[in-house]
Amino acid sequence: MSSRGVRAAGTDGTDFQNRQRVAQHYQESAQYKSILKWFFVPHFLILVFMWLKVGSELLRTNFGWKNAFFDRLDMPSAYPWEYVWCFSFIPIVLAIYSFQRNKLKILHYAYYAEFVVGIFPCMIGLGGQLPELMEYAQDMEGSNTPTFKGIFPMVIIWYIFFAVALQIHGFSMYFMHHLAAAWAPVKRD
C-alpha cells in the first residue's frame, strides 16, 4: 500500500534496510539453540548405552534378572561415577525446556547441572581409572584390567568415552554460556 503525497524530504526510499535486519542477539540465540540441540544428539546416544550398561547391572544384582546378551558381553561392574553420569540427561531436559521462552534462569540451572552431573563424574572417573591405565600400559599381557568380551581392555574404552563426553559437555557449557549472554538483558548506564 503506497502512501499518498510526496516522499519525505531527505530520503530516496532506500532507508528501509535498517528496519529489515534481525537484531544480532536474536540471530545468536537461534544459532546457539541449534548448535546445542546438535550437541544433545550424541550426548543422548552415549547416554542410552550407559543406561543399558548400568541398568542391566542393576536388574541383575537387585532383581536377579538374567539375559544371555548381557552375560555374553562380560562387562565389569559399574563404578560409582557411572551412576551419577546417568543423570546427565537432566541438563538436556532443562536446556530444551528453557529454549521455549528463553528462560534464562532455567538455562543457568542447565549450565551448572552440566558440570555437576556431566563433567565432574567424568573427571572423577578419569582420575580413578588412571592407575588402571598405567598398569595396563606397563604390562599389557599380565595386567588384571577388566576386559570387554574378555578381549579388549575396558580402561581404553573408558578413556575414549572420557575424551568424547568431556568434549560434548565442555562445548555444551560453552554454547550455553553464550546463549545466556544473548538472552541476558542489556545493561545501560
UniProtKB/Swiss-Prot annotation:
<keyword id="KW-0256">Endoplasmic reticulum</keyword>
<feature type="transmembrane region" description="Helical">
    <location>
        <begin position="151"/>
        <end position="171"/>
    </location>
</feature>
<dbReference type="InterPro" id="IPR009787">
    <property type="entry name" value="Jagunal"/>
</dbReference>
<feature type="transmembrane region" description="Helical">
    <location>
        <begin position="106"/>
        <end position="126"/>
    </location>
</feature>
<protein>
    <recommendedName>
        <fullName>Protein jagunal homolog</fullName>
    </recommendedName>
</protein>
<feature type="topological domain" description="Lumenal">
    <location>
        <begin position="56"/>
        <end position="78"/>
    </location>
</feature>
<dbReference type="GO" id="GO:0007029">
    <property type="term" value="P:endoplasmic reticulum organization"/>
</dbReference>
<feature type="topological domain" description="Cytoplasmic">
    <location>
        <begin position="172"/>
        <end position="189"/>
    </location>
</feature>
<dbReference type="GO" id="GO:0005789">
    <property type="term" value="C:endoplasmic reticulum membrane"/>
</dbReference>
<feature type="transmembrane region" description="Helical">
    <location>
        <begin position="35"/>
        <end position="55"/>
    </location>
</feature>
<feature type="transmembrane region" description="Helical">
    <location>
        <begin position="79"/>
        <end position="99"/>
    </location>
</feature>
<keyword id="KW-0472">Membrane</keyword>
<keyword id="KW-0812">Transmembrane</keyword>
<comment type="similarity">
    <text>Belongs to the jagunal family.</text>
</comment>
<dbReference type="GO" id="GO:0016192">
    <property type="term" value="P:vesicle-mediated transport"/>
</dbReference>
<feature type="topological domain" description="Lumenal">
    <location>
        <begin position="127"/>
        <end position="150"/>
    </location>
</feature>
<feature type="topological domain" description="Cytoplasmic">
    <location>
        <begin position="100"/>
        <end position="105"/>
    </location>
</feature>
<keyword id="KW-1133">Transmembrane helix</keyword>
<feature type="topological domain" description="Cytoplasmic">
    <location>
        <begin position="1"/>
        <end position="34"/>
    </location>
</feature>
<dbReference type="Pfam" id="PF07086">
    <property type="entry name" value="Jagunal"/>
</dbReference>
